[in-house]
């Protein structure tokens, strides 16, 4: 068997990240399978794709913050009591999300948000609100799955997490194929992707919960001991979670904002509906080569030996911060290569759209330029993920909050300014998203530098204090020092 000693320190990182990367890519494939379920409907396919895209992107705004409870499970859940608190938080959050879904579906608020703000016609608006109502229970199921995924990641069960997500996608693809041959294609085509989404989530949630009970539940204590900092309080969990939730909420609301501005820019015409449909089709395809880089932020908390919660998990790896940095750089280079191969090689991106989503060639050609813009996303995404993971390890997530605000400001500014430069449609949307990513990553880098300087100053002060104390207590008398020097001279 061939061995690579230079890679010894990186195998744990590879084994940990690869399943998570596959998970992220699998989610994108799942989205494409759902889009194919709509595109296969011959009548009003573009209108249905736009309606589902609007509803799905709004729903992602509610589920986004909950998926970051994975990081709470990764960092804070050290006992059964901690896990109960995390699950309780997610039950409440899921109920609140369901209430908002219902309000948007039935109230004037939903009519204003979807019909008026997006300038879509009555048909698209009513289909979007109906789809949003059907998706009301999904945030709760998604939250339960992600909470247990974080606990499994803490114990290095990333392979199980990856298998759960792949099972989710397989279930979605299977149910799309089954439902396309049912009466739903004629009576309620929107239910084809939505029911498939629910079945996939049910499979994923069940797999993760069973994995937790089989592998972890019996080995963790009922309560956390003092060596792990004691039981985590709900307040600590929420203080850690809210900046991450705010960031992910702004990431998820970015898509609805883009859809809104792109649609309004084109005046709610058929071109606007087509542009939103292009964005719906290109998001998962463009996200696929770089989306997995987001999972890099789980690496620092999982492998950093200064994190007290890692004492619970027995490990013999020798991964250092330097190894993590080099590994992160290689991941970014790999992602950039994938992006340029997929989106800049002639006819490759069109073939992906035609074969996977099932759109026609004319529609696929309209997606080429937006997809090429996605090629530049890996750099800001990698910077953000790497530094966020480091700050999560230090439990200093509060400094990340301003980055989400800057992202939205840059995004909206780009959506307003670029049309004056002749940029419209899906190209306007994806270009503005890139500008928002760059702005957010820049602010995260500034926040990380601020924390690093504070940490360095704190360590220098502690070292100086310890040096003074040791000088006062450990210094032998002057006569003893003289005797020691004389003895050394005699021996020489």
From Swiss-Prot:
Q: Which segments carry the region annotation Disordered?
A: 458-492
Give the UniProt tissue specificity note: Found in osteoblasts from mandibular bone and from iliac bone; not detected in osteoclastic cells.
Q: Which GO terms describe its cellular component?
A: extracellular region; membrane; outer membrane; plasma membrane
Q: Which GO terms describe its biological process?
A: ATP export; bone mineralization; calcium ion homeostasis; cementum mineralization; diphosphate metabolic process; gene expression; inhibition of non-skeletal tissue mineralization; locomotory behavior
Q: Which GO terms describe its molecular function?
A: ATP transmembrane transporter activity; inorganic diphosphate transmembrane transporter activity; phosphate transmembrane transporter activity
Membrane topology qualifier: Multi-pass membrane protein
Q: For this UniProt entry, which residues form the secretion signal?
A: none
State where the protein is found: Cell membrane
Q: Which family does it belong to?
A: Belongs to the ANKH family.
Name recorded for this polypeptide: Mineralization regulator ANKH
Gene (name only): ANKH
């Amino acid at each position: 068997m061939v061995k690579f000693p230079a890679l010894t320190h990186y195998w744990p990182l590879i084994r940990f990240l690869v399943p998570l990367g596959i998970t992220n890519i699998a989610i994108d494939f799942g989205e494409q399978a759902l889009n194919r379920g709509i595109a296969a409907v011959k009548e009003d396919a573009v209108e249905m794709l736009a309606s589902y895209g609007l509803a799905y992107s709004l729903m992602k705004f509610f589920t986004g913050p909950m998926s970051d409870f994975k990081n709470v499970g990764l960092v804070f859940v050290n006992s059964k009591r901690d896990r109960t608190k995390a699950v309780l938080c997610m039950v409440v959050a899921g109920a609140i999300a369901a209430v908002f879904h219902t309000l948007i579906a039935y109230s004037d608020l939903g009519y204003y948000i979807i019909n008026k703000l997006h300038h879509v016609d009555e048909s698209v608006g009513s289909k979007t609100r109906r789809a949003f109502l059907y998706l009301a229970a999904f945030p709760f199921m998604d939250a339960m799955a992600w909470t247990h995924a974080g606990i499994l990641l803490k114990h290095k069960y990333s392979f199980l997490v990856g298998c759960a997500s792949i099972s989710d996608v397989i279930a979605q693809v299977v149910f799309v194929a089954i439902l396309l041959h049912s009466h739903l294609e004629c009576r309620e085509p929107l239910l084809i992707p939505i029911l498939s989404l629910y079945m996939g989530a049910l499979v994923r949630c069940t797999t993760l919960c069973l994995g937790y009970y089989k592998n972890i539940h019996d080995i963790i204590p009922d309560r956390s001991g003092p060596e792990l900092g004691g039981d985590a309080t709900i307040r600590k969990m929420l203080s850690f979670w809210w900046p991450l939730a705010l960031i992910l909420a702004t990431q998820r609301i970015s898509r609805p904002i883009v859809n809104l501005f792109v649609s309004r820019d084109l005046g709610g015409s058929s071109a606007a509906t087509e542009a939103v449909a292009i964005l719906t089709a290109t998001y998962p395809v463009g996200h696929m080569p770089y989306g997995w880089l987001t999972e890099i932020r789980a690496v620092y908390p999982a492998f950093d030996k200064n994190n007290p919660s890692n004492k619970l998990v027995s490990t013999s790896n020798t991964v250092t911060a330097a190894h993590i940095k080099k590994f992160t750089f290689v991941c970014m280079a790999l992602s950039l290569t994938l992006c340029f191969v997929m989106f800049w090689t002639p006819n490759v991106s069109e073939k992906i759209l035609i074969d996977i989503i099932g759109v026609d060639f004319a529609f696929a050609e309209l997606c080429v330029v937006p997809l090429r813009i996605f090629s530049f996303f890996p750099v800001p995404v990698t910077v953000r993920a790497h530094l966020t993971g480091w700050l999560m390890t230090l439990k200093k997530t509060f400094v990340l909050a301003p980055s989400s605000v800057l992202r939205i400001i840059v995004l909206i500014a780009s959506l307003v300014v670029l049309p004056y430069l002749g940029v419209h449609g899906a190209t306007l949307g994806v270009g503005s998203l890139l500008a928002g990513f760059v702005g957010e990553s820049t602010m995260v880098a500034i926040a990380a530098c601020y924390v690093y300087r504070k940490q360095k100053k704190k360590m220098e002060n502690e070292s100086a204090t310890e040096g003074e104390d040791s000088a006062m207590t450990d210094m032998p008398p002057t006569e003893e020092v003289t005797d020691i020097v004389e003895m050394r001279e005699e021996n020489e």
